[in-house]
């Protein structure tokens, strides 16, 4: 096996094979259940695909079944052929005399096991690992996932096809075609954008009662984005925020908007404190599960007023602890905001980003421009 670690050495007249393998998740032997790929010659403008599914003759756990959407993609796996020598030879013929493009070394290891078992010459295989490429170029161990890189490359991801090996190989092919001529600066800009891209799985510190403080930091999966418009309790109770539910990498239409409750509160002469406490509880509930965006700098004074009001009305003390989804650092009440010019510089160029972030960025740009004029 030969490793190609320089993307500039890959020429248009070489055959490239983009592969993805799905396998069982047994504690013992991981067996291949799908081998898929695209073979491409850029200069000749030729491309064809390979897609085979196999009966692993092995128990498949529920996690893998859910991940691979088994009922749809492998509903008749018992009737599928075994991965025998003939099938292995077909795979070998598909990848030989080409540069094999992978994402991580998992696929190349599975091919090594397969070809070694059947005595095929694995030494003739040349491969290029896109994951290692980013790891080396960006000097980071936190390389974006295949699907995050797909989004960053401008691919419109069909989330219903994820973890179908043929579709994953297609995404890999598109990523490679996007990055092959990018400069180091352009690759780094992609990565900087990734820092602000909502993740499928992430954790957050969350609002905790005083009696829970001794338990330390409690982590929870972030399920929502909270976009805070106003957080002002000087002359009125202005807790204006919108909540979006996470849907894969992006966020849905708002599932909650506090403006209606604020209108009700402003129209009430009595029982307004009851409504304020109700709204505060909704705020705390979503805050415990949310990444937070705001165009306002939430001062210590305003935070103290809000928390003091809540304690007076409920006799319950709340402590605000939030880990921002993007910047990966604790946001304290005194700087409870994302405010960085870099967000505008990177994200505003990308049309994929969700509309609520566009709204935020436009407002922030106006604020920043005004600050520059004032200075």
UniProtKB/Swiss-Prot annotation:
In terms of Gene3D superfamilies, this protein maps to: Ribonuclease H-like superfamily/Ribonuclease H (3.30.420.10)
What Pfam families does UniProt report for this protein, alphabetically? RNase_T (PF00929)
Please give the organism: Ureaplasma parvum serovar 3 (strain ATCC 700970)
Protein name from the UniProt record: Uncharacterized protein UU112
Highest rank taxon of the organism:
Bacteria
Q: What Gene Ontology terms describe what this protein does at the molecular function level?
A: exonuclease activity; nucleic acid binding
């Amino acid at each position: 096996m030969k490793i190609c670690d320089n993307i500039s050495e890959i020429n248009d007249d070489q055959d490239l094979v983009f592969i993805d393998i799905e396998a069982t998740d047994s504690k013992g032997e991981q067996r291949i259940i799908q081998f898929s790929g695209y073979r491409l010659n850029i200069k000749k403008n030729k491309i064809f695909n390979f897609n085979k599914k196999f009966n692993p003759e092995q128990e498949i756990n529920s996690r893998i079944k859910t991940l691979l959407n088994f009922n749809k993609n492998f509903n008749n796996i018992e009737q599928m052929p075994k991965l025998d020598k003939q099938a292995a030879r077909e795979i070998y013929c598909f990848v030989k005399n080409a540069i094999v493009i992978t994402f991580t070394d998992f696929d190349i290891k599975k091919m090594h096991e397969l070809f070694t078992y059947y005595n095929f010459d694995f030494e003739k295989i040349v491969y290029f690992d896109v994951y290692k490429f980013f790891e080396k170029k960006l000097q980071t161990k936190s390389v974006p996932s295949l699907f995050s890189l797909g989004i960053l490359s401008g691919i419109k991801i069909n989330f219903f096809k994820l973890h179908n090996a043929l579709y994953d190989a297609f995404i890999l092919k598109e990523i490679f075609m996007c990055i092959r001529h990018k400069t180091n600066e352009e690759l780094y800009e992609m990565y900087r954008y990734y820092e602000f891209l909502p993740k499928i799985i992430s954790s957050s510190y969350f609002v905790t009662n005083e009696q829970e403080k001794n338990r330390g930091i409690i982590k929870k999966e972030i399920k929502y984005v909270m976009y805070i418009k106003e957080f002002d309790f000087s002359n009125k109770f202005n807790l204006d925020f919108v909540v979006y539910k996470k849907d894969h990498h992006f966020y849905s239409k708002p599932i909650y908007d506090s403006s209606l409750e604020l209108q009700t509160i402003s129209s009430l002469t009595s029982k307004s404190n009851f409504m304020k406490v109700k709204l505060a509880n909704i705020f705390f509930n979503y805050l415990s599960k949310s990444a937070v965006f705001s165009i306002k700098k939430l001062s210590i004074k305003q935070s103290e007023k809000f928390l003091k009001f809540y304690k007076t009305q409920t006799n319950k003390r709340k402590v605000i602890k939030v880990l921002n989804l993007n910047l990966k650092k604790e946001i304290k009440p005194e700087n409870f905001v994302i405010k960085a010019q870099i967000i505008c510089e990177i994200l505003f160029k990308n049309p994929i980003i969700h509309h609520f972030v566009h709204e935020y960025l436009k407002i922030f740009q106006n604020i920043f421009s005004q600050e520059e004029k004032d200075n």
